[in-house]
Amino acid sequence: MTTYVLTAIGDDRPGLVAALAAAVDEHGGNWVDSQLALLAGKFAGIVQVELPDERVPAFLEALPALSEEVGLSVEAAEGTAAGEEKGPCSVLRLHLLGQDRTGMVREVTSALRSQGATIDGLRSWTREAPEGGGMLFEAEAEVRLPEDTQEADVREALETIAAELMVDLELDAPG
């Protein structure tokens, strides 16, 4: 079996996920994991699939037809099997909340990068602050630290950024 990661985007409409799932199934594939979202009228998704080695070429050739048939643009990249991609590490959950402003994601991710951390998952959104206080930016992330990175160093780097940005930041073990 070969593992592929698919990225898909298209104008939102009924049947997009069904069309992609059918293409995977028609080639003997298995839908392993996915993250799907609707953002600004666009459907976007990332999907991990496993395919029989001998069916991979036909599957890859079939993907452009999804664009013609349902307006779904799909890219495929060979991945690693589940569980093979991560070495020894620790994982932290990050939650950030503060007044929305440009550069927040850049600042936080730069601090994480400086500590050698990897972002395994990130979800962010904006919402109106209570009593007309403008827009709030909120983010949740799962952060992976390499074996040689100290959690205290990551925490210190993020707390420094949080103070500069004037945001609330929580960092704890997932659970």
Q: Which stretches of residues belong to each language-model region?
A:
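A conserved regulatory-domain signal marking ACT and ACT-like small-molecule sensing domains
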Residues: M1-G175
